[in-house]
From Swiss-Prot:
Name of the top EC class for this enzyme: hydrolase
Gene3D superfamilies in UniProt: YqgF/RNase H-like domain
InterPro entries found in the cross-reference section: RNaseH-like_sf (IPR012337), YqgF (IPR005227), YqgF/RNaseH-like_dom (IPR006641), YqgF/RNaseH-like_dom_sf (IPR037027)
Annotated source species: Lactococcus lactis subsp. lactis (strain IL1403)
Functional description taken from the UniProt entry: Could be a nuclease involved in processing of the 5'-end of pre-16S rRNA.
Annotated protein name in UniProt: Putative pre-16S rRNA nuclease
Record keywords, A-Z: Cytoplasm, Hydrolase, Nuclease, Ribosome biogenesis
GO CC, alphabetical: cytosol
GO biological process: rRNA 5'-end processing
Superkingdom of the organism of origin: Bacteria
A molecular-function term among this protein's GO annotations: nuclease activity
Amino acid sequence: MFARILGLDVGTKTVGVSVSDLLGMTAQPVETIKIDSEAGELGFERLGVLIKEYKPEKVVLGLPKHMNGDEGIRAEASRDYGTKLANEFGLEVAYQDERLTTAQAEKVLIDGGVRRKERKKSIDKLAAVLILQNYLDAHALKL
């Protein structure tokens, strides 16, 4: 069965969104959604539109871990977001270690000559691409 997977990089102010191809081989950037986690605005209205558009079978959330592998407050917040997302949309939610993905995304943008102002707009969705691509690579179908 061919189906897409959404990848999310969830922060306190934005959610970077990526999507896989139907074969589950590559991740592409979609957009960055502004949120306000402290006010309870989680971006679910916009995510609902994207879920209807892409019809994913699953959503992969980045799981922020400490360098020693321990989970802290941000990982707990990510898991809480995932639980709310699963309850809201009835989709399976998986988690992918996101250590260093934002740093990798920033390096890619800097190496590509992207100006600081533009990097700020793109970094979260590129981090979402890296999170999803890492997940796809780790769960690749053995053909």
